């Protein structure tokens, strides 16, 4: 079961390949759900990268349920982490692919916002793909409320509830990296207050300039009286990890998002040297068009837009299949 749909495996009778089918039930029941479904479809159409789940078909049933058909990967990182400890080379390779995907996503002007092990799919060849873009948003938005799963939520989301950018995905990736190293979640908060407390136990109290960016008076009243805590060396917690792994993690789990490492910088870190190839870490050809995102439209309008996108997808797909192959003449 996904965030707002049911996912099952099936076989494509034309290609004989296994696929995943995500059923969005009653997508036009509310404007919010209509918009979210439209956003996910637009993103899946736009984002084309080896480390991002790819859309292979989409259709609407007579009852107006929507079906996204994507490639099928055998498992996800959450299942892998709960089944056995990961060996060093797998941790490196998985982190590399996560960051390679994030570099592309961020270059398209997109923030995933809900990166967590269950949204990271893996196949038997250890190929990794990021999925579930239902919560994705434009970079640097004015947003309200909590979005991502608590354990992987960046502190600026908890502290400000207002502005955040691509760095929230780097924090989430850092939490996932730590979980791969340790075999258990790094910050398993019971609620957002407990979550923040666990983070400060390891990373210390947020710097004053970070606290000054807090927009919510309630959050300020909670944070300012807290006792000062010093940042603990991550090497003390991750005693079995390589120094280079700990150093990269230190650069990903930074309270101040402005000082957090970017995806392309993390890819160039010595820890990922066995896989890093700057000529094979592509960025998006163009930014994603977010012009629809602030629209407050009725369900019927979202429905028309959705049907238009689906028709466009099938027309483009048919044109690509009908196009004559180049013979070099």
From Swiss-Prot:
EC number: 2.7.11.24
Entry-annotated residues carrying Phosphothreonine: 144
InterPro entries with a match to the protein in the record: Kinase-like_dom_sf, MAP_kinase, MAP_kinase_CS, MAPK_p38-like, Prot_kinase_dom, Ser/Thr_kinase_AS
Pfam families: Pkinase
Notes on activation and inhibition: Activated by tyrosine and threonine phosphorylation.
Modified residues (Phosphotyrosine): 146
Binding site for ATP: 1-7, 22
Protein kinase domain mapped to chain residues: 1-272
Top-rank taxon, per record: Eukaryota
Cofactor(s), by name: Mg(2+)
Keywords from the UniProt entry: Activator, ATP-binding, Cytoplasm, Kinase, Nucleotide-binding, Nucleus, Phosphoprotein, Serine/threonine-protein kinase, Transcription, Transcription regulation, Transferase
Active site positions, chain numbering: 114
Role noted for this protein: Proline-directed serine/threonine-protein kinase involved in a signal transduction pathway that is activated by changes in the osmolarity of the extracellular environment. Controls osmotic regulation of transcription of target genes.
Family: Belongs to the protein kinase superfamily. Ser/Thr protein kinase family. MAP kinase subfamily. HOG1 sub-subfamily.
Domain notes: The TXY motif contains the threonine and tyrosine residues whose phosphorylation activates the MAP kinases.
Protein name (database record): Mitogen-activated protein kinase HOG1
Source organism: Exserohilum turcicum
């Amino acid at each position: 079961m996904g965030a707002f749909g049911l996912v099952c495996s099936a076989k494509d009778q034309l290609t004989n390949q296994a696929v995943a089918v995500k059923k969005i039930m009653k997508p036009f029941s509310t404007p919010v759900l209509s918009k979210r479904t439209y956003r996910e479809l637009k993103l899946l159409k736009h984002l084309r990268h080896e480390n991002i789940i790819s859309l292979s078909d989409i259709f609407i049933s007579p009852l107006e349920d929507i079906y996204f058909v994507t490639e099928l990967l055998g498992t996800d990182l959450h299942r892998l982490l709960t089944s056995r400890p990961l060996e060093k080379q797998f941790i490196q390779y998985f982190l590399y692919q996560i960051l390679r995907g994030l570099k592309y996503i961020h270059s398209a002007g997109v923030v995933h916002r809900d990166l967590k092990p269950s949204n990271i799919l893996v196949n038997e060849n250890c190929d990794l793909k990021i999925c579930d873009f239902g919560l994705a948003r434009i970079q640097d938005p004015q947003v309200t409320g909590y979005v991502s799963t608590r354990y992987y939520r960046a502190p600026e989301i908890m502290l400000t509830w207002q502005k955040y950018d691509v760095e929230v995905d780097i924090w989430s990736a850092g939490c996932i990296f730590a979980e791969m190293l340790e075999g258990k979640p790094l910050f398993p908060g019971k609620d957002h207050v407990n979550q923040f407390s666990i983070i400060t136990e390891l990373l210390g109290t947020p710097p004053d300039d970070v606290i000054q960016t807090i927009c919510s008076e309630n959050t300020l009243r909670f944070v300012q009286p807290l006792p000062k805590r010093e940042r603990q060396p991550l090497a003390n917690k991750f005693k079995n990890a390589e120094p280079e792994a700990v150093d990269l993690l230190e650069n990903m789990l930074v309270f101040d998002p402005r000082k957090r490492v970017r995806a392309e910088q993390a890819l160039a870190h010595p820890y990922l040297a066995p896989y890093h190839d700057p000529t094979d870490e592509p960025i998006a050809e163009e930014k994603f068009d977010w012009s629809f995102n602030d629209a407050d439209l009725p369900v019927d309008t979202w429905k028309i837009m959705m049907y238009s996108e689906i028709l466009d997808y099938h027309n483009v797909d048919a044109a690509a299949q009908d196009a004559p192959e180049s013979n070099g003449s």
